[in-house]
């Protein structure tokens, strides 16, 4: 699979041409990353790191001299990978309840009193929001504040999710053809098959128009319909 992925990245007209596919990691390196995170990565993602690449379609997992993390991740993004990924509806309800209790200036006798309560509320709201993605790695940056997540802890371990909170406040599972949350392997191989088939810029534009219309969309693009 690595050879085919290298060839895809080298091919012009794919949108990937000219990019270099990062090297694989060793078993020792993967274990170091897992020990630091306090988890064992889902087996298919582990095999990707060992046999295909430390990056590529996903953010590169690398050691910066002090710690292992995914390239481009915020310092606190992966602080609690060992915590089980929560039930989405329960976590969303807690977040919405917090926003309904957002302090209002008119309810306070002074600016100072309002700011003090607002700061306390903001800290609690931030913690609730972070808890919604505990146990999940920000594996791919989709731009505009959107991310694709790989769940590494809890009952949904091994499944792929889309973080659409930038606009809709929701986290949705990325569904396979059976309407179940896709695994990393399903997500990656589906992306690869679609990408490998797009050989010209014209074909790419036409295909993306179809996807946007809901026709033949790959797993990674299905968050609109999740």
Which sequence ranges carry the predicted segments?
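Residue-identity detector for threonine
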Residues: 5, 14, 120, 148, ...
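A surface-exposed partner-binding patch
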Residues: 1-131, 135-140, 221, 225
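Basic, Gly/Ser/Thr-rich N-terminal segments that form RNA-phosphate-binding interfaces in CRISPR RAMP
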Residues: 64, 153-155, 185, 203
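Generic detector of low-complexity/intrinsically disordered segments
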Residues: 63, 151-152, 162, 173-177, ...
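Long, compositionally biased interface segments
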Residues: 168-226
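Low-complexity, glycine/alanine/valine/leucine- and proline-rich hydrophobic stretches
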Residues: 138, 146-170
